Amino acid sequence: MSPKNPVSNFISADEEMLAFLSNLGQKWCVSDGVAEFIERNFTFVGSKPVLQILKDYKTSDYKNFADIKNFLSSNPSTQSKILSGEISYVGDNLTGAGVKIASEYFYDFLKFTVENIPEHRYFCSPETGWILLVAMEGYVEFAVLD
């Protein structure tokens, strides 16, 4: 009997994320330019965008996905902006691929990323200018470009 090689079973975070989206359906695609949109349009301090100075800024601490969902659903105008069209996503560490998803996938995809991929998550809409940062340190921020 040969010993198992644990590395041969390894899949990258990108592969895991894309497989998850494939299981949801076909209303998504890999999307270049998500990180560039964020870098061009937001001011950064260190590795994170400064959102506190922007319109409609809201923040909350979270311990799990349910806390994030409660934060968003308790702010109907925020939730409405997020769910009003296609949503772009990029992580800042383990995932290299940006993706664009249908809004109907948002909560399932958010839950998957929070529970499975340890990185800061950026959801945004280049078309309408909103951004949602879900930080690994346990806080979430939402803001809209002026």
Which residues does each predicted region cover?
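Structured alpha/beta or helical-core interaction and ligand-binding surfaces enriched in interleaved
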Residues: 1-146
